[in-house]
Structure formats: C-alpha cells, structure tokens
Amino acid sequence: MKRQKRDQTERAFVKGYQAGIEGRSKSLCPHESGLARQQWLNGWRESRMDQWDGYSRLAQVQKITNLHPMSMSG
C-alpha cells in the first residue's frame, strides 16, 4: 500500500505541541520563517495553554493523538 506523505504544516504543529509538552522554549523553533514556523508556534502555544488549563501530560499526549492519529508514530 502506498503511504501518503504528511502535510508539512500539520507536522510542524504536532512537533510544536510536543515541544510545549516537554517544556521547551518557543525560541527553539527549528523553522526560520513562513507557515511552518507559524504552525509550530501555534502548536507550542496550544500545548502551553492546555497545561495552564490543567491538562496532565498524559491528557495532552492523548489529545494530540486524537487530533492527528499518525503524528505520534514516528
């Protein structure tokens, strides 16, 4: 079966969310500019807001897995 390539902006969002879960600084964004950087920062911000709203680390992992089912597999 042919694998479908993931959308780069979706991947950037997920990676940003994961960075937020791990408590990393937003200044560590690997993207210099453009839509990928914006999506990475959006993911990072959403993760931080979820932490402030009381989500546990496990709940955050579950949330991102539900939003993007293939994101945590690699």
From Swiss-Prot:
Disulfide pattern: none
Cell compartments where the protein resides: Cytoplasm
Domain of life: Bacteria
GO cellular component, one term: cytoplasm
UniProt keyword terms in alphabetical order: Cytoplasm, Translation regulation
Location, primary (coarse class): cytoplasm
InterPro entries hit by this protein: Ribosome_modulation_factor, RMF_sf
GO BP: regulation of translation
UniProt similarity note: Belongs to the ribosome modulation factor family.
Function noted in UniProt: During stationary phase, converts 70S ribosomes to an inactive dimeric form (100S ribosomes).
Descriptive protein name: Ribosome modulation factor
Gene of this entry: rmf
